[in-house]
Swiss-Prot record:
Family designation: Belongs to the ribose 5-phosphate isomerase family.
Database matches in InterPro entries: NagB/RpiA_transferase-like, Ribose5P_isomerase_typA_subgr, Ribose5P_isomerase_type_A
BP-aspect Gene Ontology terms: D-ribose metabolic process; pentose-phosphate shunt, non-oxidative branch
GO cellular component, one term: cytosol
Protein's name in the database: Ribose-5-phosphate isomerase A
Role played: Catalyzes the reversible conversion of ribose-5-phosphate to ribulose 5-phosphate.
The organism of origin for this protein: Synechococcus sp. (strain CC9311)
SUPFAM superfamilies assigned: D-ribose-5-phosphate isomerase (RpiA), lid domain, NagB/RpiA/CoA transferase-like
Length: 238
């Protein structure tokens, strides 16, 4: 990651933390930008600038980081509300539709985003695209005994799906739910994310896919202007 990209991520993470208020239950996302947000939240709590905050994490890594920083946590099943969820994205299109799941935790991320009263997406400017899936693969979480069948069905839908392999262990990536991940590319990208999310999730053996449709309320973008990192709230198109 370049120094400029790090500056963009830091700026947008700080802007998101600034929207957290005392007494909130906050969904804590996953990924590099979300990690900076969690660190910023922990620092504000430690300094007494925020209080009575409860976090709901979306990944094991986020849970460990938040606990190390002293952020009180609550399980999703024990939560009757989430006031605000903050998470990153791998791609964002002009209509605020997203691809997430580069870290293979999109199931929990989607559950938290869906529960939240307000969902803020934090990205740097490199994550903005005109069409989803032209560059970033679409993750699909599948039952271990169904990945070949799902791979075949995705092919019939025009997608090329490959089993995601681990880099620090032999064999495939295994999700927090004990499932596998197929990474899918559609040749011309995804023209109708809403329909495709539904169609993929209707395939037997699929738990969830990484299309987040009609969930984001605001997209904060970190960008560099005149050599200085800043943040803007993206205007939704369509």
């Amino acid at each position: 990651m370049s120094d400029l990209q790090t500056q963009m991520k830091q700026a947008v993470a700080e802007a998101a933390v600034a929207q957290i208020r005392d007494g909130m239950v906050v969904g804590l996302g996953s990924g590099s930008t979300a990690a900076l947000m969690i660190e910023g939240l922990g620092a504000r709590l430690a300094a007494g600038q925020l209080r009575d905050i409860v976090g709901v994490t979306t990944s094991f890594q986020g849970e460990v980081l938040a606990a190390e920083l002293g952020i009180p946590l609550r399980a999703l099943n024990a939560t009757d509300r989430i006031d605000l969820a903050i998470d990153g994205a791998d791609e964002v299109d002009p209509s605020f539709q997203l691809i997430k799941g580069g870290g293979a935790c999109h199931v929990q991320e989607k559950l938290v985003a869906d529960r939240a009263e307000r969902f803020i997406v934090v990205v740097d400017s490199t994550k903005l695209v005109r069409c989803l899936n032209l560059d970033f693969l679409l993750p699909v979480e599948v039952l271990p005994g169904a990945w070949v069948q799902v791979q075949s069905r995705l092919k019939s839908m025009g997608g090329v799906a490959e089993l995601r392999m681990a880099t620090r262990k032999a064999g495939p990536v295994v999700t927090d739910q004990g499932n596998l991940v197929l990474d899918v590319r559609f040749e011309n990208g995804i023209s109708d994310p809403i329909a495709l999310e539904r169609d993929i999730n209707n395939l037997p053996g699929v738990l969830e896919n990484g299309l987040f449709v009609n969930l984001a309320d605001e997209v904060l973008v970190g960008e560099i202007k005149d050599g200085v990192a800043g943040v803007r709230s993206l205007d939704r198109v369509g």
